[in-house]
Curated annotation (Swiss-Prot):
Belongs to the UPF0434 family. It comes from Wigglesworthia glossinidia brevipalpis. It comes from the Bacteria. GO terms for cellular component: cytosol. This is UPF0434 protein WIGBR2520. SUPFAM superfamilies: Trm112p-like (SSF158997).
């Protein structure tokens, strides 16, 4: 994931910073405990595409 992109995108639910999970290849919002998939290198930042994750 491009670091420049990570600096400008935000969670579409709460507008907080997203983190990239290198192992799972997804974007994580720690505040909302949700993940957003990345398909073909494109982050899918739609509320309906998010899924819950366990608090880490």
């Amino acid at each position: 994931m491009d670091k420049k992109l990570l600096n400008i995108i935000a969670c579409p639910i709460c507008n907080k910073k997203l983190n990239f999970d290198l192992i799972r290849k997804e974007l994580i919002c720690e505040f909302d405990s949700v993940a957003f998939p990345i398909k073909d290198g494109i982050p899918i930042l739609l509320r309906d595409s998010s899924y819950p994750i366990k608090k880490r």
